[in-house]
Regions:
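C-terminal helix-rich "cap/oligomerization" subdomain common to oxidoreductases
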Residues: 9-12, 47, 51, 55-58, ...
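Contiguous beta-strand/loop segments that form the cofactor/metal-binding neighborhood of enzyme cores
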Residues: 127-222, 250-261
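A structured beta-alpha segment of the ubiquitous adenosine-cofactor-binding alpha/beta core
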Residues: 1-7
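Predominantly a Rossmann-like dinucleotide-binding segment in NAD(P)-dependent oxidoreductases
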Residues: 66-171, 287
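Structural detector of well-ordered beta-strand residues that form the stable sheet scaffold
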Residues: 34, 59-61, 91, 142, ...
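Short, Asp-centered acidic motifs that coordinate Mg2+ and/or phosphate
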Residues: 8-9, 89
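Short glycine-/small-residue-rich Rossmann-like dinucleotide-binding loops
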Residues: 6, 14-15, 195
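Beta-strand-loop-alpha-helix segment that lines the small-molecule cofactor/substrate pocket
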Residues: 9, 15-67, 82
């Protein structure tokens, strides 16, 4: 594939541990790359991918598909137009009752995946927050990652398992739950995520809280706007056409190759998410707040 001059673009949809190698090899072979999220297992690996992109000048976009989600882009317009006022706090919840994927397999092996709930699900939520809030500069990060419910693999009770079935002779050494707080030059961002928890309800949403209004986005669905007007509280759901955001992403990738237009999913834009996730893991391991320069 890399030696074929007719191949202009490569889509990398492999396990996380080979994202950097394949993407870098493709870039150096003169191919444009759309690499699935997360960019890599670590911030260091993501930086190496970015370095090679700069050297080659080819496209390197990361599969943060929500940047092509019509619901997310409408929320961004609300915020950019000042409809919510000053956004002072954003909270992301990505918690499931029992949703550890492929217990004992690639998803739960740190050497392959790089992490668990944070790097698999949290990457989407953090990316949405940063995108909608205008990519504010990050100052400090604190967090804690837990490996609790899945470590006793044979004792882990579940009703369904995506990417299954379980491999009880495999490895489980990643986070199944995570909490964090990120201070930026814009809003404070808090997060609580879990592949698995001993609470029955799934809670997958993002709350944007401003001094003029607020928005709750139900992940993958629509959103509700909360505000006040003429002394009365208001609450409404915008109605709009939702296109397939995966198709939007692919169409935009092809278009940027043709036009040279830099997309919101370019490695330069989204690498901050890799840095934040790395800082949460570092904070958890070192039991201290991490300052980002």
């Amino acid at each position: 594939v890399l030696a074929d001059p007719e191949v202009e673009a490569v889509s990398v949809c492999t396990p996380n541990n080979v994202h950097p190698t394949i993407s870098i090899d493709a870039l150096r072979a003169g191919k444009n790359v759309l690499c699935e999220k997360p960019a890599a297992r670590t911030y260091k690996e993501a930086l190496e991918m970015q370095k090679v992109q700069h050297e080659t000048g080819k496209v390197l976009n990361i599969g943060v598909v929500n940047r092509f989600n019509d619901s997310v882009n409408l929320i961004k317009k609300y915020i950019d137009d000042g409809k919510l006022g000053n956004i002072y706090h954003v909270h992301a919840s990505f918690r499931a009752h029992r949703s550890i994927p492929g217990l004992g397999g690639a998803f739960t092996t740190k050497a392959i995946a790089g992490g668990g709930a944070l790097i698999d699900w949290g990457v989407h939520y953090l990316d949405i927050v940063m995108y909608c809030c205008g990519d504010p500069k990050v100052k400090t990060v604190t967090g804690e990652a837990f490996c609790e419910l899945g470590k006793d693999m044979k004792g882990y009770a579940y009703t369904d398992m995506w990417a299954g079935p379980p491999k009880y002779d495999g490895t489980y050494d990643v986070d199944d739950s995570v909490v964090g707080m990120i201070r930026t030059e814009g809003p404070v961002i808090s997060l609580h995520g879990a592949w698995a928890q001993n609470i029955g309800e799934n809670e997958c949403y993002i709350d944007f809280m401003g001094d003029k209004g607020g928005i709750r986005l139900q992940y993958g669905k629509d959103f509700t706007v909360y505000s006040s007007e003429y002394g009365a509280l208001t609450e409404y759901k915008p109605v709009f056409k939702m296109r397939d955001h995966f198709q939007n992403e692919i169409d935009a990738f092809i278009d940027c190759i043709k036009t040279g237009k830099k997309l919101p999913s370019h490695i330069d834009t989204v690498i901050i998410t890799a840095q934040m996730m790395q800082a949460i893991y570092d904070s958890s391991e070192q039991h201290k707040e991490i300052t980002l320069g």
